UniProtKB/Swiss-Prot annotation:
Cell compartment(s), UniProt: Cell membrane
Stretches of the chain found on the membrane's Extracellular side: 1-85, 139-162, 225-259, 331-348
Family: Belongs to the G-protein coupled receptor 1 family.
Name under which the protein is recorded: Neuropeptide CCHamide-1 receptor
SUPFAM superfamilies in alphabetical order: Family A G protein-coupled receptor-like
Gene responsible for this protein: CCHa1-R
Gene3D superfamilies: Rhodopsin 7-helix transmembrane proteins (1.20.1070.10)
Length: 499
């Protein structure tokens, strides 16, 4: 592109400096800075739904910048015309596959339904929504010189972009707060502690509030975005512009600053405060001796989740840093339009792609850091390729079928197996009838009517224990007692996508 600009500048200089006879005149008109003008024109023509670069509220600046005699680099001669669509195709495929699988895992696997995973589900929904509604439209910004989708999709694209950014950054802030309470003050029910109903209700309320707040922040883009026609070299360039002129000349600057504060600076400061407090607490806890081994393991697990959330925050900060740097420079630097050069042009394109790449980065990061998500992702991925052949042979598809981890069903299967062994005269398996104490009201000691024998399962006993109806090495535990113990400690059977 730089070579094309130099060639154009040379041709224009030759046309200005020579007359029809080929001799140089005695006095030449002043030579304009053609290179800077061409960069400015490339900036204006490639305005997009996500990247309005010119404050068109000032008609004087626009008339000085866009002239009918100055050439510009056509889209077909720009490298970003071919590079950006390829990158957006990769973002679309990875984002749909990763976020879609993440949503399916959460909805299909009951053990995944806890507080941290609920926030991760909210992130995946926002990312999948912006990938489906905005990425296909935004991929053509560097391909064609006009917005071909109409005014409605212009407003919808801008709105969904702001909603997705808002849900992402607000959810990361909520996750950081949840990790703070889980590590520093684990007795409070503001985090995923045992999957309690109160924690679940509060998590759902927080997630819904985040979506409502993000929708509220995106309403200005939905209402104000419209199509704008620009005339360049007798061409009509149509762009999707989110800052209407009738809303004031400083409206664009105000929105750029507001987006930086609400969508980036303030949430990252809050997250940083949470993690500084977590680090101080962990440093203090490490100096206190005599902790129980189980508590140490629990703290380590929560610390791992906190590190994973911090990785999501770092990815978000890196992806949107060029975005805010470019916009703050362009709208608040006094000579930004005059200083726009190759460096800022490349930075603008990189920031444009990185802002959308954030929507597919979370599932990729989660796949590498979370063994639970990696296991379920591989299971569903293999299911699509192998289920057909296995079903035709009548075989059980171990990749597709979800194994029920409930201890109740496991205990029932163990009893059926031992009862079958008893029928086959295997001595190590027995069926015991327990004595039921009947009360005068016709019930047992728990107040429940029992008309059949209570089934019991063999469990290992301590050495030297004597049991009348069982081998010395075995005892029997009632099935209903096992179920009661399972319900009293459900946290052991829950998984987290962040583990």
């Amino acid at each position: 592109m730089i070579a094309n600009l130099v060639s154009m500048e040379t041709d224009l200089a030759m046309n200005i400096g020579l007359d029809t006879s080929g001799e140089a005149p005695t006095a030449l008109p002043p030579m304009p800075n053609v290179t800077e003008t061409l960069w400015d024109l490339a900036m204006v023509v490639s305005q997009s739904t996500q990247w309005p670069l010119l404050d068109t509220g000032s008609s004087e600046n626009f008339s000085e910048l866009v002239t009918t005699e100055t050439p510009y680099v056509p889209y077909g001669r720009r490298p970003e015309t071919y590079i950006v669509p390829i990158l957006f195709a990769l973002i679309f495929v990875v984002g749909v596959l990763g976020n879609g699988t993440l949503i399916v895992v959460f909805l299909s696997v009951r053990q995944m339904r806890n507080v941290p995973n609920t926030y991760i589900l909210s992130l995946a929904l926002a990312d999948l929504l912006v990938i489906i509604t905005t990425v296909p439209l935004a991929s053509t910004v560097y391909t064609v010189e006009y917005w071909p989708y109409g005014s409605f999709l212009c407003s919808l694209s801008e709105f969904m972009k702001d909603v997705s950014i808002g849900v992402s950054v607000f959810t990361l802030t909520a996750l950081s707060g949840d990790r703070y309470f889980a590590i520093v003050d684990p007795l409070r029910k503001f985090h995923a502690h045992g999957g309690g109903r109160r924690a679940t209700r509060m998590t759902l309320a927080t997630a819904v509030s985040i979506w409502l707040l993000a929708i509220l922040c995106g309403l200005p883009a939905l209402i104000g975005s419209n199509l704008k026609h620009l005339g360049i070299n007798e061409k009509s360039i149509v762009i999707c512009y989110p800052y209407p002129e009738e809303w004031g000349i400083n409206y664009a600057k105000s929105m750029v600053l507001l987006h930086f504060l609400v969508y980036y600076a303030i949430p990252l400061v809050v997250i940083a405060v949470f993690y500084v407090l977590i680090a101080l607490h962990l440093m203090y806890s490490a100096s206190v001796p005599g902790e129980i081994q189980g508590a140490v393991r629990q703290v380590r697990a929560r610390r791992k989740v906190a590190v994973t959330v911090l990785a999501f925050v770092v990815i978000f900060g890196i992806c949107f840093l060029p975005y805010h740097v470019f916009f703050l420079w362009f709208y608040f630097w006094p000579t930004a339009q005059d200083d726009y050069n190759a460096f800022w042009h490349v930075l603008r394109i990189v920031a444009y792609c990185m802002s959308f790449a954030n929507s597919c980065a979370n599932p990729v990061a989660l796949y590498f850091v979370s063994g639970a998500f990696r296991k379920h992702f591989n299971r569903y991925l293999f299911c699509r390729g192998a289920s057909g052949r296995r079903k035709k042979r009548g075989q059980h598809d171990t990749f597709c079928m979800h194994r029920d981890t409930s201890l109740t069903s496991t205990a029932s299967k163990r009893f059926q197996s031992r009862h079958s062994c008893y029928q086959s005269t295997i001595r190590s398996c027995r069926l015991q009838e327990t004595t039921i104490t009947t009360l005068p009201n016709g019930g047992n000691q728990n107040g429940a009517n029992i008309s059949a024998v209570e089934l019991a399962l063999p469990v290992l006993q301590a050495p030297g224990h004597n049991e009348a109806h069982a081998p010395p090495s075995y005892g029997f535990l009632p099935l209903n007692e096992i179920v009661q113990q399972t319900r009293s400690s459900p946290a052991k059977f829950q998984e987290s996508l962040l583990n």
